[in-house]
Amino acid sequence: MSNQDALSNTMYDILNAMGKDAEFLYDTIDKYIKDAQDANKQYLVDTWQKIKDDKLNHVSMLKDALEKEIHGQ
């Protein structure tokens, strides 16, 4: 495997950040939203929903960055 084929530090960083955001989105955030709903705390529902929306945006940004890394831009 040539050095160019190896996973670069920047590509690793992107994948690592995507993994952390994805784990939070798919394993955690909906439970937090439900807990806030069950506690009848709309301000927390809104807060967690905003965080979820932001994380989804971050994942999209990281996906775009990863595509640029893959294509050498």
Describe each region flagged by the PLM.
Residues M1-Q73:
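Iron-associated oxidoreductase/ferritin-like identity signal
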